[in-house]
Amino acid sequence: MSVPPGSIIVSDWHRCPDSREFFSKILHKKRRRKFGLLEAPMMPPQMNVDLVRYKVFLSGKTGVGKSALAARLAGLDLPKMHYETTGIETTVVFWPVRLKESGRVLFFRFELWDCGESAMRRFDHMLLSCKEKVDAILFLFSFTDRGSFDDLTNQISRITEPSDRVVKLVVGTKFDLFMHTDVTESDVTHFQEVWGLPVFRVGGDVSAGLGEVAPLLNALAENLWHQDCMAASSVSISPQAALRETSSEIIV
């Protein structure tokens, strides 16, 4: 089960005045900065901020909008035309959050992995590479493609095991094209009741800024942090030491 929104981090913190100096590090002229695989936001030396890294795999049928979602979450220009990803593409997304209990600020670094469906069918190692040391999986479907929604259960069963320690969230794309929807709200509600997974909705061609991506990025951050804290407590590590030994660093 997922963590209730706002139970661990401050919801809508991106709207609060005290978040501006942190969000300014991922913005340039009111647009999101583009970060390469080896880049990170620059912070003043006196402001020690913990950076936590996570690998996130985007799963879904061809045409549901995996590449578009990655671009949207990173604040990049959305693809003007559809093309199938020929191999594996990675996109880096930085997102600051404030923990409710301690007031501590964390910078999350999400490395989004997107692989074309045809490539995964042709080369078995593609899926294995995407799943290797993965922390979270976003299962995508399109509101305009009933088949992609019906395929969700197959995706989840094929890609994950009940014993996997991985955060699972579902994203419905092209939600703004309601005139052409093939998936009803009752369908979504029934799916959530059966699988216990939250479903997030994103639009099609137009990006609406931080407010549009905040619910999904906050949910990713909240569930991943909770997962790590639970894992740490199971081996008697204090929550303050829950920063991942192999993937945490201080931004300077």
Swiss-Prot record:
Positions in coiled-coil regions: none
GO biological process, one term: exocytosis
Domain of life of the source: Eukaryota
Function summary: Potential effector of the planar cell polarity signaling pathway. Plays a role in targeted membrane trafficking most probably at the level of vesicle fusion with membranes. Involved in cilium biogenesis by regulating the transport of cargo proteins to the basal body and to the apical tips of cilia. More generally involved in exocytosis in secretory cells.
Gene assigned in the entry: cplane2
Span list, region Small GTPase-like: 46-252
Similarity comment text for this entry: Belongs to the small GTPase superfamily. Rab family.
Alphabetized PROSITE patterns for the sequence: RAB
Annotated Gene Ontology cellular component terms: ciliary basal body; cytoplasm
Subcellular compartments: Cytoplasm, Cytoskeleton, Cilium basal body
Name of protein: Ciliogenesis and planar polarity effector 2
Keywords on record: Cell projection, Cilium, Cilium biogenesis/degradation, Cytoplasm, Cytoskeleton, Exocytosis, GTP-binding, Nucleotide-binding, Protein transport, Transport
